[in-house]
Every structure is written in C-alpha cells, then in structure tokens.
Amino acid sequence: MPITRMRMRPWLEMQINSNQIPGLSWINKEEMIFQIPWKHAALHGWDINKDACLFRSWAIHTGRYKAGEKEPDPKTWKANFRCAMNSLPDIEEVKDQSRNKGSSAVRVYRMLPPLTKNQRKERKSKSSRDTKSKTKRKLCGDSSPDTLSDGLSSSTLPDDHSSYTAQGYLGQDLDMDRDITPALSPCVVSSSLSEWHMQMDIMPDSTTDLYNLQVSPMPSTSEAATDEDEEGKLPEDIMKLFEQSEWQPTHVDGKGYLLNEPGAQLSTVYGDFSCKEEPEIDSPGGDIEIGIQRVFTEMKNMDPVMWMDTLLGNSTRPPSIQAIPCAP
C-alpha cells in the first residue's frame, strides 16, 4: 500500500511552528503571513545547512532526495519548492513585502482560508477551460498553409457534375461573358527597332582653343615680285660670306692648314678662283646663280690635293705665328 504523505500547507505550518529552520517564521500569525529565506546561492556567505535547509527538507519529504544516495543539489531543491508553492491554490505571495536581492533576501506569503467544495469545483472547471483554450490556440498556431492545402486536396469530388450544373443556361452565360468582357485590341509586336544615335558633344580641352576657321587670301602680284627679289638676294648673301671670311693657308712641320688672320688677301686663299662682278641686270639672280654654279662645278671636278698645293704654294708663313711643339 502506498504511503500517504502530508500535503504542503499543513507540512509548512508544522515547519514554521517548530522553529527549527533558521529564517522561517511568522510575520503576522493572525493574518497567516510568513516569510521564507530566499538568499541566492552565488552570494558570499551562503550556507547549505542554513539557507537551503527548508528546500532540502521538502525534497526529503517528497522522496526526491535521500541522504547518502544522491549528491546534494540545492539548485534543484529550490526550483521544485518554488513550483510547489506556486501551484497551491490557498497560498499567495505578498510581492510588495518580498525582498529578492541581497544577503537578507526573503519571500513573504499569505495563507488563504481553506476552499469549500463548490469553490474547488469552480476552480477546477476554470482550470480545465484554460487548458482547453491553450490547446486550441496551440493547434491553430501549428496549422500551416501546407496542411490546409492537404485537407482541401483530400476532399473527393464526384465524377458526374450533371446533377448540379444548369444545362439550359450555359449558352446565356457565355453570351453574358462576351458582353461583359471588353474587346481587346490585338497586340502587334514588331521586331524592327528604330535607329537611334546617342548625341555626344565633343568639347576641347580648354575654351581658349575655340577659333574660327580663317582662309588666307591669294597673294597679289606685288607680293609675288618681292618673293622673287628675296630669292635673287640669296646668292649675294653667300658672296658676302665668302668676302668676310679671311682664311690664310699656312703650314707647321710640313703639315698645312688654313688660318683666319685679319689682313689676309682673298687671292692667296682662293688661288686662281675668283668671281668677277657682273653688271646689274633687271632680272636679279639670273647670271649670278650661273657664275656660282660654274665655280662650284670646277671645284668639284678638281683634285683636292692639287687645290691644296696651289693654295699652300703661294702663301708665306706670317712672322707673328710660332709653331707649338708637340709633347713627347
């Protein structure tokens, strides 16, 4: 036969009246208000024999803990005791007097008068309604669109639909649908695309480069004459260069070279080649160009060695120039 154990409320009253558990005492015995020590196990100075004595006694009373058989688990003891206190219909917590923090943390409870049979029945019916509503809400939350679609697909439909289809009004329905539906214009899709070009304005790097196009005018007859005069003056400039340069042939240790000394004679430098002044002609540059071309042609055909000997044979060494001996 199972052993009947004492219910929590009378067992708790007996523990309070015994004064064996430290911190468990009446605050107001007339109003049945009492306090339970509720110190957190993580705080400094927490003792299992002092702060968890009530929870351990309840675990031993319910048979969930036996000394020597299981290791002490004060955390589980306290959780089980709290759940049992919250499940009691005739005990409620006085939250405005409870202290949940610190080393002197306590919870204050009040014992209510015992319930009658009618009150117990009402309480049970209310709890049953609450549980039913909770299960319904849970089922509604679990239902998904997939389950609804499965339920709809599971319903079978008859193969013969003639029993609930009005055959006489089929043509009228079609005519009404045609009248209601607006006439839609046919959609024509053309594969040809109109040619388009992206307009792009090419700007210069700087605005200072913007110049208008200018066309040079044709040269006049006077300007053309000046150009011909300039071409005729070119040979005269060349002759002046020959006259200004005064190179004299000389030699040092049997080696000849040309020397540019002031006062030298053109005949000694150029030898037998000389240019005679021609009378001025109305068309400048005509005969002068022919004479210069003749001189250069004779110089080109003549042997350069003979030309140098001719130049050096007629020259004398000036007394002002001294030979510089080469270092050994």
Curated annotation (Swiss-Prot):
Residues 5-113 bind DNA. There is a cross-link at K276, K300 (Glycyl lysine isopeptide (Lys-Gly) (interchain with G-Cter in SUMO)). The modification N6-acetyllysine is found at K78. It is found in: Nucleus; Cytoplasm. InterPro entries: Interferon_reg_fac_CS, Interferon_reg_fact_DNA-bd_dom, IRF1/IRF2, WH-like_DNA-bd_sf, WH_DNA-bd_sf. Residues 92-164 are annotated as: Disordered. Keywords: Acetylation, Activator, Antiviral defense, Cytoplasm, DNA-binding, Immunity, Innate immunity, Isopeptide bond, Nucleus, Phosphoprotein, Repressor, Transcription, Transcription regulation, Ubl conjugation. The keyword Acetylation applies. Transcriptional regulator which displays a remarkable functional diversity in the regulation of cellular responses. Regulates transcription of IFN and IFN-inducible genes, host response to viral and bacterial infections, regulation of many genes expressed during hematopoiesis, inflammation, immune responses and cell proliferation and differentiation, regulation of the cell cycle and induction of growth arrest and programmed cell death following DNA damage. Belongs to the IRF family. This is Interferon regulatory factor 1. The gene is Irf1.
